[in-house]
Amino acid sequence: MAAVEALNRLRGLDLENATLSVWAFKKSTSRNAKFRTSSVVATPELATELKRIARQWIDRCTEVDDYSLIATINESSCLYLESDETIFPQLQDLVSSPPEEHLIEAISDLEGSLGYLIRLTIGADTLHCVCRLGSDWKVKKRAHVLNLVLNRNQLDLAGDEAFIIPKRFDFFVLNTDILVTNKGNFESILEYKKTYAISF
């Protein structure tokens, strides 16, 4: 029942009027912390687009099952578990800090990021939308191609410091509830693999 309630609450959120911050995160080499984070300032246009993508991925979820080792996800389903079963609270603590105190200082702060998340505050609720990035998320990898942008009917250079992000989110964390839309990426980001002891 908790899974269905969590999905219904997620689907009912007013994302359009939410306060948004954007964070990139990397794995930490420290023994005490699993992640390092940097915040980035999103233009109003980017904020609107990120909310639109989040809404699109939330709306496609019409079914939910409890997370398990053998559970699968189809194009209209997601899996449910509680965040305290994972290391997500460590990432959550970092992105709960004021974004302006953790702004990126150089492009290298973004290069090699494991993922990015948007943090949306809607009244008393906080929603984290998390996406794993590819291993090639580096500006220097695109030294032999041109980044172009289409503006009206004109093609122009987008500049050398362009990044590409997927139009998806791999999991959503609403307060303490996690709803997973990509099991592999979720497990990779949070180093999560639920195991079972089988008694004979």
Question: Where does each model-flagged region fall?
Answer:
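Charged, amphipathic alpha-helical stretches
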Residues: A2-L50
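Acidic, low-complexity, intrinsically disordered interaction modules
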Residues: T29-S199
